[in-house]
Design a protein with these regions (language model features):
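Conserved glycine(s) in the ABC-transporter nucleotide-binding domain "signature"
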Residues: 1-118
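Anion-binding and metal-coordination hotspots
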Residues: 2-6, 10-11, 15-17, 21, ...
Length: 506
């Protein structure tokens, strides 16, 4: 479309001016014109004060065409007219923490062409506003963040590698500035691990095959996360996927104490995956700390006597205590393992804790295990809602297995975790042909159904109320929520990173 000044003489009054536009008519598939604005007779326009109406409106038409051309250029620009503003809450937190100067000092070992704190902020804003790769951040996110500086793609790559090369420094900066505003509570700390998988076939020095939370068979990496008493992250660590997560509990707590100047006694809280004799030794003997762990109640973790005690009804020493909501519905019930003091001035007294013997290798290359005794309270709980959920899951697995076993030879790799409910037995037929026979492991199924809803907590805090121990332990759902938020909303799986520093920075 373009504008032009049309001059005509429709009457004896003289020259008549109109602004016309031409356009393409899709119906006739031809160019056409139409009146955009009627201006009037030249004589009337002169009488209104315009000395030369033809020249005057010719200039206006020229300006209209220039504006039209400028608008067209804006429409085909590769820059979006929309701007992200959802980062203002995060920006306010950055401003409150006031850590730009510290970040720039930490990054001063390298010469940057910009304030490194601006890059640090912008990368965080980008990952919160629209999670994705570094290329996506460069092309589609950072240019559209309101009031944020732009960076070249090479600058982003360099900064990401620099951050990942020593990411603990930035965690230390965060903790330092948080401590300036809020007093961090570290009398209890929560610890858990997760892992991330990568769409690659071959292992790298950092990405190794190991047990995956998503049952992925390829290389993975692990992340250990430590939270304070308010369930605010304190520290994190990344490690190859083939390594055990258990040593990282000790390492993170040691680093957290030294970096944050924590000298008092703390209570380590973790699930049964972190419960091992070496971690208990590190907490109680080496660090003079305490612990609250869950403990497996099936298999070889407990003696037959203790397993029978878990299922036992009330007797003279062991009584279940109900915990109910305000309308009287049972939330859970609990009991503690009772012991009789055999000697001393309190001989014959019944207490809800006992001395338990543990043994472990202090160093991996030690020839002998070290034995040590811990004064420990053991609390068993029963949750009816959890019991119903677990029984439904077991029955669903069993029904699925029955269908599989009825029409094919089951292979452990096909069944996955459900293999625990299947007996695999090699049978020799006439000494020539070996066939693998499969059958349901009814004993295992019955045992799991029997213990559904039960859980055991073990703690060094023998004077603590069992309900308080239960409450503290179940705050672990916060760390699980942290991982869930990271993996879902923030897409924290570093699918677009390959080397260790980039993965850590992501």
């Amino acid at each position: 479309m373009i504008y032009f000044l049309k001059k005509s003489t429709p009457s004896k009054k003289g020259l008549y001016l109109q602004i016309y536009s031409n356009y393409y008519d899709p119906n006739t598939k031809k160019k056409n014109t139409k009146s955009y604005k009627a201006l009037g007779y030249v004589s009337d326009l002169k009488a209104s004060g315009i000395d030369d109406p033809v020249s005057y409106y010719s200039d206006i038409v020229k300006q209209m065409n220039e504006q039209l051309l400028e608008n067209k250029e804006l429409q085909i620009s590769d820059k979006s007219t929309q701007k992200y503003a959802g980062h203002f809450l995060v920006k306010a937190m950055f401003d409150l923490l006031d850590m730009d100067r510290t970040i720039n000092i930490v990054a001063s070992t390298h010469k940057w062409q910009y304030k490194f704190s601006d890059m640090y902020r912008t990368l965080c804003y980008s990952q919160i506003l629209s999670p994705g790769s570094k290329l996506k951040a460069f092309e589609r996110v950072i240019p559209n963040i309101y009031d944020a500086p732009n960076f070249s793609y090479d600058q982003i790559l360099d900064a990401v590698n620099f951050i990942g090369g020593d990411y603990h420094k930035y965690i230390e900066v965060l903790n330092h500035h948080i401590n300036d505003i809020w007093e961090r509570k570290t009398d209890k700390v929560y610890f858990d691990c997760t892992n991330y998988y990568f769409e690659i076939d071959l292992e790298t020095p950092f990405l190794k095959k190991g047990p995956s939370k998503e049952n992925f068979k390829g290389p993975i990496m692990g992340q250990a996360l430590l939270l304070d008493s308010d369930q605010i992250p304190l520290d994190t660590e990344f490690y190859p996927g083939n390594e055990s997560e258990k040593p990282y509990l000790r390492k993170r707590i040691e680093d957290m104490k030294s970096r944050n100047g924590v000298h008092g006694r703390i209570i380590q809280v973790a699930d049964k995956g972190l419960n091992c004799a070496r971690n208990i030794y590190a907490a109680v003997v080496e660090a003079n700390d305490g612990y609250i762990f869950s403990k497996s109640i099936k298999g070889r973790s407990l003696s037959k006597e203790e397993q029978d005690w878990i299922l036992m009804d009330d007797d003279e020493f062991n009584k279940w205590e109900d915990v109910r909501d305000e309308v009287g519905n049972l939330i859970y019930k609990y009991k503690t393992s009772k012991h009789i003091i055999r000697s001393g001035k309190n001989a014959g007294k019944v207490v809800d804790y006992g001395n338990y013997l543990y043994k472990c290798k202090i160093n991996p290359d030690d020839e002998k295990e070290t034995e040590f005794t811990v004064k420990e309270k053991r609390i068993v709980t029963y949750n009816p809602k959890l019991a119903a959920k677990q029984r439904a899951e077991i029955n669903r697995e069993v029904e699925k297995l029955k269908k599989i076993l009825s029409y094919k030879i089951a292979v452990k790799e096909d069944i996955g975790d459900s293999a625990k409910y299947v007996n695999f037995e090699a049978k020799d037929k006439d000494g020539r042909k070996i066939k693998v026979a499969t059958s349901l492991n009814q004993e295992k199924i019955d045992a799991d159904l029997k213990f559904a809803g039960f859980n055991m907590l073990v703690t060094s805090e023998v004077k603590a109320d069992p309900k308080e121990i239960y409450k503290v332990y179940h705050n672990l759902w916060r760390i699980e929520e942290s991982f869930r938020l990271l993996k879902t909303y923030l897409q924290s799986r570093p699918a677009f990173a390959s080397d260790e520093d980039t993965i850590n920075a992501f």
